[in-house]
Structure formats: structure tokens, C-alpha cells
């Protein structure tokens, strides 16, 4: 028998370990090389581990919940070129009733195997064997059983006293919590605010949006304008494109901008590499790609590593103003917010303008107030007159 090991994928140096989330195959089940057999989760992404060959799952060495390292053995497969389906022995039953026998020598999990999925789910949620033992399985009569299971008379006293649902934090949520606490404890974080008139950007999008979409195949949003404004501002204020490493200040020559992306598992920050060399279309396409990958849990670890500055947009959720938290080891983060029409005094006259509050949180250990305020004002000025990028002022 040729046994092939199932290995944890290569993890980058910044990722210490991962946790086994879910096995999709059981020992003895046939597997093809295309199958995703187990999911593992790092503090950044969910990784799918595919079978290295065709065969039968022979052994699971790391169960769900286990902490594993890079290239650690998760289990092994007995390689087989000609796989024959292994028929699982059927449980003893009649066509009409499921046999109830206290001496029936199989596990509770196996006993409920022949119930329809909807019924198995309810039984597992109830976690009450007495409920199961009171039921006869009537073929194709799921509604009767569901009604029986949901009857309050079947609920024990302990169930009635439970008013909470306790679940284990995901690795991503744990890491987010750790990093937020790390930022609070290890940085001198301060936030400065400003506001920007978004009418010039709105007018640009309205004027060239249709042409842009026809040429590049993607709609132009607000984020590329902010990325470009940040890139130009970082060139003028190198101390913001830097970080503290013990007693040293590290200045970065490349401009890698992290973009906060909301996913079902939490917020992640994939990186726009060398954003200063990207066109508006490149930025928009990459952000769209990150969003899709985030929803589908397909973001790669290398896409999350190495950003030097972060942009986050709470405005898409309706936030009018906030104080974004620095993404360590970075030294600053820009917060975008909701665009809202407000009366503004312009040259002695009141005008209704689409305004957005901007927030820059920064590490005061490295960045002084003068630099932080000037940096944010530079972003504001570029957004209100995008021609500044063309003539570099």
C-alpha cells in the first residue's frame, strides 16, 4: 500500500500556525485528487487543502480544532488508481418505522443517520436522546416529526433556562482582537479630522464614468481617487510611509496600500502592491477582485502581507464619522465616511455640498501633529482638485 501524506500548505514566516476547521471526508471514504478534504484557518485566511492523489482516506492525525504548523502532516491517503465505491452498511430498519431498541449496539450519531437532513439537524440542535427515543421514523412524514421535536413539552428544564448561544471565536476574529489590543497598548494613537467637498470627484465620475466602464470593463468608484491621493501624499510625507522597529525607524521605498475589505468572517486588509505604479483602472479592478475573493474566502496569505498604509471606508455602512484604529506595524490609517449633503459657507454664500469627513489615525511616537495634519490637508486638496496630480502640486 502506497500511503501519501496530506500536508499543511506552506505558511509564510508571519503566520505562526493554523487551526483545523473541518474535515469533509471520513476515514474509509474514497477521494479524488480534485476533492477539498479539509479546511484550515490561519489568523488571516481560510485555506482549502486538496487531496494529493486518488485513493481512500486512511488516517486523520489532526482532528478539528487542532493547531498545526506549516507542512505538518494532517493525515494520509492510501493511493488507488481504480477506486471502487465502498458501500456503507445500512442500518437495520423497516420501510415504515425506525426500530427503537435500547440494546441496539450503535452510537447515537449512527442511529439518526437515516433521518432526513432537516430532522437530523433539529435532533442535533436539541441534543436530547430522550426526544429521539420517543420518536418513530415515519417515512416521508418529516413535518410530523418536526412538529413533535419543536413541541415545548419535549424540552427539558435545562433547555428552558438557556438564554445564550456561546460559540468559539474564529482564528481571524481572535487575531483581530489581539491586534486591536496591541495597537491600544503599544502605540500612542491619535486621530485628526478634516472634511472634503466631494462634488469635484462626483462630477468627474458622472462625466467620464460611462466611457471609463466601456474602455476598462469596470465601473469607477470613489476608492481609486482616494488611493491616488494617498499615494501622492505619502511621497511628500515619507515619515507616514514608515514604521517603528524597536529603536529604529524603517522608511519604505515602495508604496503598498492596504484596503480594508469586509467579509463574512471579519475585516481583512489585502494589499495594493506598488500602488504608485497602478492606473485608476488597475486599482478598481484589484479592489473588485479582493471583494469577490473575500466573500468566497479565497484571499491568499501573500495578498495580505506587507502593506505600509491602510484605507478603510466606513461610509459604505453609513458611518458619518469614526476614529479608525491603526493596522500594526503600520503607523497610520485613513478613514473614509458617508457622503452627506450639508450647508457650507463658500465665499460668503451658503451652498449645499456633498461633504465627507476624513479621519487620519496615526502613531504619535513617529508622526508629529504638523505632519499628520498637513498630510490629511494634502489628501483633501487633491480630492477637491484632482488636476493637482497632473501638475504635481
From Swiss-Prot:
Gene3D superfamilies with a match to the protein in the record: 2.40.50.100, Chloramphenicol acetyltransferase-like domain
Modification N6-lipoyllysine, positions: 44
GO biological process: L-lysine catabolic process to acetyl-CoA via saccharopine; tricarboxylic acid cycle
Active site residues according to the UniProt entry: 364, 368
EC class (word): transferase
Chemical reaction(s) catalysed: N(6)-[(R)-dihydrolipoyl]-L-lysyl-[protein] + succinyl-CoA = N(6)-[(R)-S(8)-succinyldihydrolipoyl]-L-lysyl-[protein] + CoA
Functional note: E2 component of the 2-oxoglutarate dehydrogenase (OGDH) complex which catalyzes the second step in the conversion of 2-oxoglutarate to succinyl-CoA and CO(2).
Protein name: Dihydrolipoyllysine-residue succinyltransferase component of 2-oxoglutarate dehydrogenase complex
Organism: Buchnera aphidicola subsp. Schizaphis graminum (strain Sg)
Amino acid at each position: 500500500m502506497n500511503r501519501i501524506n496530506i500536508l499543511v500548505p506552506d505558511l509564510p514566516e508571519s503566520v505562526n500556525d493554523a487551526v483545523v476547521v473541518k474535515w469533509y471526508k471520513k476515514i474509509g471514504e474514497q477521494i479524488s485528487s480534485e476533492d477539498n478534504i479539509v479546511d484550515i484557518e490561519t489568523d488571516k485566511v481560510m485555506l482549502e487543502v486538496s487531496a494529493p492523489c486518488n485513493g481512500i482516506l486512511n488516517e486523520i492525525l489532526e482532528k478539528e480544532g487542532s493547531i498545526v504548523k506549516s507542512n505538518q502532516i494532517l493525515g494520509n491517503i492510501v493511493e488507488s488508481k481504480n477506486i471502487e465505491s465502498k458501500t456503507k452498511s445500512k442500518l437495520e430498519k423497516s420501510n415504515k418505522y425506525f426500530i427503537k431498541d435500547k440494546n441496539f449496539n450503535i452510537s447515537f450519531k449512527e442511529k439518526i443517520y437515516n433521518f432526513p437532513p432537516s430532522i437530523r439537524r433539529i435532533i442535533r440542535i436539541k441534543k436530547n436522546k430522550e426526544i429521539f427515543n420517543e420518536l418513530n421514523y415515519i417515512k416521508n412524514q418529516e413535518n410530523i416529526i418536526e412538529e413533535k421535536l419543536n413541541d415545548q413539552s419535549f424540552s427539558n428544564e435545562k433547555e428552558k433556562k438557556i438564554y445564550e448561544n456561546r460559540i468559539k471565536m474564529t482564528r481571524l476574529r481572535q487575531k483581530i482582537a489581539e491586534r486591536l489590543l496591541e495597537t491600544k497598548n503599544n502605540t500612542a494613537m491619535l486621530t485628526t479630522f478634516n472634511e472634503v467637498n466631494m462634488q469635484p470627484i462626483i462630477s468627474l465620475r458622472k462625466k467620464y464614468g460611462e466611457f471609463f466602464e466601456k474602455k476598462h470593463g469596470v465601473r469607477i468608484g470613489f476608492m481609486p481617487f482616494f488611493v491616488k491621493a494617498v499615494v501622492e501624499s505619502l511621497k511628500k510625507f515619507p515619515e507616514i510611509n514608515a514604521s517603528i522597529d524597536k529603536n529604529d525607524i524603517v522608511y519604505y521605498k515602495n508604496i503598498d496600500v492596504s484596503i480594508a475589505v469586509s467579509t463574512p468572517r471579519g475585516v481583512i486588509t489585502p494589499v495594493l502592491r506598488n500602488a504608485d505604479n497602478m492606473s485608476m483602472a488597475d486599482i478598481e479592478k484589484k479592489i473588485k477582485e479582493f471583494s469577490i475573493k473575500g466573500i468566497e474566502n479565497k484571499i491568499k496569505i501573500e495578498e495580505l502581507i506587507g502593506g505600509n498604509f491602510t484605507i478603510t471606508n466606513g461610509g459604505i455602512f453609513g458611518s458619518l464619522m469614526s476614529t479608525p484604529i491603526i493596522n500594526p506595524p503600520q503607523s497610520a490609517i485613513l478613514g473614509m465616511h458617508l457622503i452627506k449633503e450639508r450647508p457650507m459657507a463658500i465665499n460668503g454664500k451658503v451652498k449645499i455640498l456633498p461633504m465627507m469627513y476624513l479621519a487620519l489615525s496615526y502613531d504619535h511616537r513617529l508622526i508629529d501633529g504638523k505632519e499628520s495634519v498637513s498630510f490629511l490637508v494634502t489628501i483633501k486638496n487633491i480630492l477637491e482638485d484632482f488636476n493637482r496630480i497632473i501638475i504635481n502640486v
